[in-house]
């Protein structure tokens, strides 16, 4: 007999109800929280077609005053540049942004200090800045 979590990959997740309401995520095989995210709860959701990242946010939790519509449009621009994950779906009513999964890991401060990593970082910045202009400038101190 299968356990509830085997039948429902969202069982036990803080955003389970919200995740279950998204048609794209129906038939998910696995769902697991991802670390990080200052203003989001992030999940790796694996579908038959492959993994996605679901970013869930609360409007009132955004201490950085992030405009989520701008974040969506800027994510599209980053994807178009080739520096960001593809944007799969933006669901403002559910407070979600769903993007493609990129295999890898986030660099730590220590990783950035390794000289051999600097060309990769510079290349990623070059690709991003050569792409479409973001719809706004973000300054968390403004």
What name fits each language-model region?
Residues 1-30:
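Juxta-kinase regulatory segment immediately upstream of eukaryotic protein kinase catalytic domains
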């Amino acid at each position: 007999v299968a356990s509830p979590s085997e039948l429902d990959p969202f069982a036990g997740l803080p955003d389970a109800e919200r995740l279950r309401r998204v048609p794209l995520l129906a038939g998910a095989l696995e769902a697991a929280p991802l670390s990080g995210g200052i203003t989001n709860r992030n999940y790796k959701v694996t579908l038959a077609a492959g993994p996605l990242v679901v970013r869930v946010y609360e409007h009132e939790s955004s201490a950085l005053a992030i405009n989520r519509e701008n974040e969506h449009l800027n994510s599209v621009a980053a994807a178009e540049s080739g520096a960001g994950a593809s944007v799969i779906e933006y669901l403002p009513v559910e407070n979600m942004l769903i993007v493609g999964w990129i295999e890898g890991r986030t660099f730590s401060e220590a990783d950035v200090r390794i000289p051999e990593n600097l060309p990769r970082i510079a290349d990623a910045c070059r690709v991003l800045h050569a792409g479409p202009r973001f719809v706004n400038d973000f300054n968390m101190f403004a």
